[in-house]
UniProtKB/Swiss-Prot annotation:
Disulfide links within the chain: none
Protein name: Probable glycine dehydrogenase (decarboxylating) subunit 1
Gene: gcvPA
Catalytic activity reported: N(6)-[(R)-lipoyl]-L-lysyl-[glycine-cleavage complex H protein] + glycine + H(+) = N(6)-[(R)-S(8)-aminomethyldihydrolipoyl]-L-lysyl-[glycine-cleavage complex H protein] + CO2
Job description of the protein: The glycine cleavage system catalyzes the degradation of glycine. The P protein binds the alpha-amino group of glycine through its pyridoxal phosphate cofactor; CO(2) is released and the remaining methylamine moiety is then transferred to the lipoamide cofactor of the H protein.
Keyword Oxidoreductase attached: yes
Subunit text: The glycine cleavage system is composed of four proteins: P, T, L and H. In this organism, the P 'protein' is a heterodimer of two subunits.
The entry's keywords: Oxidoreductase
Matches recorded under CDD domains: GDC-P (cd00613)
């Protein structure tokens, strides 16, 4: 919105309309001691060239872009084909909105349809929606969907689910009038995988769903088939959460292992990690009419027009739009359409072979780094289960926070200090590796860890 200052004539006219004679009279309700009686302490304005130099000087103070980062924990830096950046700027794509007159925008609808197809193939489930806000909101919506489908209220959450995702579920559940008592947490086993025996004990006749990470927050890959069997025996649904879908380029899909609903964070597939987003949530479920009617968000379907020409439409729109709020399966407004478009473009450019090759590089580099760290005195890998490209390290000296601060002085972000999330894990560091890390990057981290003095 433009800012146009009021003229003296306009100010006088407004004062007359409210029966006042001056601005002083207008502000009389504000105590004098609370008023600013001097000019603001601001430097004089700059011309454009001077302003650009000033901003460049400020930008130079930011070290983040020059740091070697091994952060993950839900946001990952992969290589994206740069051609998509230019394509996204085309006017027919550059909007976050699903079209208000959707059938007119066949190009946009086709892109969303292709996005749904990609999500369906990655998650291994036939029904995928047009995107969610992010992985956390996708999980929360999946939990609400499971409650509607089963008529039950209880949710069992494995300790391997991202803590922020659990917080989002708590917020959504509170929003529908249910309390935290309907959410039950179960710690992971000693090897880092979901504790099947503990989950089995936690599931009862009021349990709507069980949520497990695949891979989980600690990077661990567990066999979720056993969890699926227990869930289905007791009438509960299994929901899986994937933080980096690149893992599913190598692993069996959640759908093939028995998941009823699978959600994931789509940021790694085509969005650079930034402070606060933007992100995009992936959501897929079983091919069942009851599930289809309860899927949150929008669905794009393929059809033909009266001439027999293929076209795309919003399918079952009255399930989610055009009805009363309390009857809708969700209430997404401005959705992640542009982010979904970016993911679609970049995944199509990468291709299936490129997707698998990048995932193989992630795995190989992470395994190499694990071996090198395990050789260092004072370091160990506390979780014995397989991992993809993220893993937990028990650090020398028992203080991961101190280690991360020391390595930051060397220009290295060593990973996430897990003590910031759970005080019991203050001696553990969560490290993530992607195909963007070179052998020299890995060697630099190992050298930094080796030289750390508690």
């Amino acid at each position: 919105m433009r800012y146009l200052p009021h003229t003296p004539e306009e100010i006088s006219e407004m004062l007359q309309a409210v029966g006042l004679s001056s601005l002083e009279e207008l502000y009389s309700a504000i105590p004098k001691e609370a008023r600013l009686t001097r000019p603001l302490s601001m430097e004089p304005s700059l011309d454009e060239a001077s302003l650009m130099r000033h901003l460049e000087e400020l930008a130079q103070k930011n070290r983040a872009g020059r740091m070697l980062s091994f952060l993950g924990a839900g946001a990952y830096e992969h290589h994206f084909p740069p051609a998509a950046d230019q394509l996204l700027l085309r006017s027919e794509f550059y909007t976050a909105y699903t079209p208000y007159q959707p059938e007119v925008s066949q190009g946009t609808l086709q892109v969303i349809f292709e996005f749904q197809t990609i999500v369906s193939e990655i998650l291994g489930l036939p029904i995928a929606n047009a995107s969610m806000y992010d992985g956390a909101s996708a999980l929360a919506e999946a939990v609400l969907m499971a409650r509607r489908l089963t008529g039950r209220e209880r949710t069992v959450l494995s300790g391997g689910v991202h803590p922020d995702y659990i917080g989002t579920v708590e917020t959504y559940v509170h929003g529908i009038g249910a309390g935290k008592a309907s959410l039950v947490g179960v710690d992971v086993g000693r090897d880092g995988t979901a504790d099947v025996e503990a989950l089995t004990r936690a599931i009862d006749e009021t349990t709507a769903c069980v949520v497990v990470g695949y891979p989980n927050f600690f990077g661990v890959v567990g066999d979720i088939r056993k969890v699926a069997e227990v869930c289905h025996q007791k009438g509960a649904l299994l929901i899986t959460v994937t933080l980096d879908p690149y893992a599913l380029a190598l692993l069996e899909s959640p759908g093939a292992l028995g998941a009823d609903i699978a959600v994931a964070e789509g940021q790694p597939l085509g969005l650079p990690p930034q402070y606060g987003g933007p992100n995009v949530g992936l959501f897929a479920c079983r091919n069942d009419r009851k599930y289809l009617q309860q899927v949150p968000g929008r669905l794009v379907g393929e059809t033909v027009d009266k001439h027999g020409t293929r076209g795309y439409v919003l399918t079952l729109a009255t399930r989610e739009q055009h009805i009363r709020r309390e009857r809708a399966t969700s209430n997404i407004c401005t959705n992640s359409g542009l982010c979904a478009t970016a993911v679609t473009m970049r995944m199509c450019m990468l291709g299936k072979r490129g997707f698998v090759e990048a995932a193989k590089q992630c795995l190989a580099k992470a395994e190499h780094l694990k071996r090198e760290i395990a050789r260092l005195e004072g370091y160990s890998l506390p979780m014995s289960a397989p991992t993809f490209h993220e893993f937990v390290v028990k650090v020398r000296g028992g203080d991961a926070g101190k280690l991360t601060r020391a390595l930051a002085e060397q220009g290295i972000i060593a990973g996430l200090d897990l003590g910031r999330i759970d005080a019991r894990r203050r001696d553990e560091l969560l490290v993530a590796v992607t195909e963007r890390h070179s052998r020299a990057d890995l060697d630099r981290l190992v050298a930094g860890l080796a030289g750390f003095t508690p």
